[in-house]
Amino acid sequence: MMSRTPERDLTMKTSSILSLLCSAAAAALVAVSAASAAAAPEPYIPVISKGFQHQFWQAVKLGAEKAAVDFKVKITFEGPENESQVDKQLEMVQAALAKKPQALCLAALDSKAVVPLLRKAQASKIPVVGFDSGVDSDIPVATAATDNVAAAAFAADKLAQLIGGAGEVAAIIHDQTSRTGIDRGDGFVKQMKSKHPNVKVVDVQYGGGDQLKSTDLAKAIIQAHPNLKGFFGANEGSIIGVLNAVKELKKEGKIVVIGYDAGKQQKDAIRKGVEAGAVSQDPVGIGYKCVEAAAKAIKGEPVPKTIDTGFKWYDKANIDSAEMKPLLYD
């Protein structure tokens, strides 16, 4: 048996102390790491829409906020006062990028004008996700939107059917600069020309999504074309303008009206039979899917380039159905 010496006792004590110190240091490191992880800020994603005035955008906002909770990210949601303020939206994008976000969600008012700012985002390795309206660039890693060409073509088919396959029709489109405006206008007009040769599109005007301007434009069209049989409004503001014009000129029941999106005034008109029906998007789904794609892109996870959020036709027969209820906002 080895005899104990003062030197050996000292060595053993020193070893024990060092072992305890190492264990304490390791535990402290784990605790600090855990605290740091808990205190790490959530990734920030600014969500910039085309506007704030329509209930459509409020529904998109609800979806975006739900995704922010589910995917543990922080979002802000903003848009210009109306959908004609392209410069205002560009300022918002510039200000958002200056905050160095981890990603950006954008519904572009002008599919071309925003591209230089998106190049800056790309250079800063900030993934961009489009929603509702795409851009003329492959910079966005994904775009969550309705297939607006197909949806507007479907609206053209419905209108042609409801007027008996022949006659004069017109349309109010929200703009000719955003991807949604271009696609809905083209989808409607081209489908009517190619599939319904006996239906003539006599006028297409652009109201900026503004109800008052759209009302004035629709009234002018109706007065210029007394034989008008059908009218298409391509978004919430546009169709409300058409409904106002039809009412003011006492043409309710004489002109077949078809719309896009939802909102209380449009839903009431459909229930009363003043409006034949409308194409509904899934605004909550659009908001959710764009933030989901952005959150995944931040982590480097793959996301589909195009996220088709779908559309449905609704009229008096199915407006209160369980299938339509989640898609129709007030």
Where are these regions (language model features)?
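A residue-level marker of the well-folded mature domains of exported/periplasmic proteins
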Residues: 4, 8-9, 13-16, 37-330
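Bacterial N-terminal signal peptides
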Residues: 22-33
